[in-house]
């Protein structure tokens, strides 16, 4: 899988892949990372890429020409590249999206917004999908793009050292993962559930299921509602 980050600040991207799992995945050739600076496509002598808004308003906007030209040059090399914009106005990115992109795509282009945003004409002309990472505003799309890249990458075979790590994770089937406990000395007054250490795997699985349901219902009632609908649909088949 190849990831191309279109950004005004490449240094925000490069450091993320210098440690841990994604560094190993990159070294092993399971993922390929590149970053493209929009300023390279500016015809302004000072490499300016932003402009004031039509109709007024606070903040500068990244002009459409530099975005479209950057994407056009990449698409000329790979027509199959999927163009994703990371913007507050996008649809919520989910675990299901991460799995889908990992399974179906080979090259993701992650366009990172900045300032007051990207000219809407560039989005309409180039975006295959527009994603948002949550109901909050970041200073730029780079953090969101890295989060998307991380979520997709770990679904690629071989990226995680233990493939079992993907099983039963939070958001699988709209449920949060059950609590986990380290095999270390118990802090005073903070014992783990006794069933976890008794070796009866059937009972452990049943307990984890109950705890997963309770955790989801408490922390994420929105997900729990989706889970209940999913289970209801299964019963109708």
Swiss-Prot record:
It catalyses: guanosine(37) in tRNA + S-adenosyl-L-methionine = N(1)-methylguanosine(37) in tRNA + S-adenosyl-L-homocysteine + H(+). GO terms for molecular function: tRNA (guanine(37)-N1)-methyltransferase activity. InterPro entries: Alpha/beta_knot_MTases (IPR029028), tRNA_m1G_MeTrfase_C_sf (IPR023148), tRNA_m1G_MeTrfase_TrmD (IPR002649), tRNA_m1G_MTases_N (IPR029026), tRNA_MeTrfase_TRMD/TRM10 (IPR016009). GO terms for biological process: tRNA N1-guanine methylation. S-adenosyl-L-methionine binds at residues 113, 133-138. Coiled coil: none annotated. Its main location: cytoplasm. SUPFAM superfamilies: alpha/beta knot (SSF75217). One of its GO terms (cellular component) is cytosol. Transmembrane segments: none annotated. Keywords: Cytoplasm, Methyltransferase, S-adenosyl-L-methionine, Transferase, tRNA processing. Belongs to the RNA methyltransferase TrmD family. HAMAP family: TrmD. NCBIfam families: PRK00026.1, trmD. Specifically methylates guanosine-37 in various tRNAs. Homodimer. This is tRNA (guanine-N(1)-)-methyltransferase. It comes from Wolinella succinogenes (strain ATCC 29543 / DSM 1740 / CCUG 13145 / JCM 31913 / LMG 7466 / NCTC 11488 / FDC 602W). The gene is trmD.
């Amino acid at each position: 899988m190849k990831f191309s980050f279109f950004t005004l600040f490449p240094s925000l991207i490069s450091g993320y892949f210098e440690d841990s799992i994604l560094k190993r995945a990159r070294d092993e050739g399971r993922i390929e990372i590149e970053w493209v600076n929009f300023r390279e496509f500016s015809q302004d002598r000072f490499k300016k890429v932003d402009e004031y808004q039509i109709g007024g308003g606070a903040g500068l906007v990244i002009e459409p020409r530099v975005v479209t030209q950057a994407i056009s040059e990449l698409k000329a090399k790979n027509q199959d590249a999927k163009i994703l914009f990371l913007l507050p106005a996008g649809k919520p990115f989910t675990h299901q999206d991460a799995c889908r992109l990992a399974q179906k795509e080979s090259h993701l282009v992650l366009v990172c917004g900045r300032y007051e945003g990207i000219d809407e004409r560039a989005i309409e002309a180039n975006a295959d999908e527009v994603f948002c990472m949550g109901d909050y505003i970041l200073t730029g799309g780079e953090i969101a793009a890295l989060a998307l890249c991380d979520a997709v990458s770990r679904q690629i075979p071989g990226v995680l050292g233990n493939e079992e790590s993907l099983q039963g994770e939070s958001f699988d089937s709209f449920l949060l993962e059950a609590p986990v406990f380290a095999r270390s000395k118990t802090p005073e007054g903070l014992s783990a559930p006794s069933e976890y250490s008794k070796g009866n795997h059937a009972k452990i699985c049943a307990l984890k299921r109950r705890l997963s349901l309770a955790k989801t219902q408490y922390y994420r009632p929105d997900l729990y509602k989706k889970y209940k609908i999913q289970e209801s649909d299964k019963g109708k088949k």
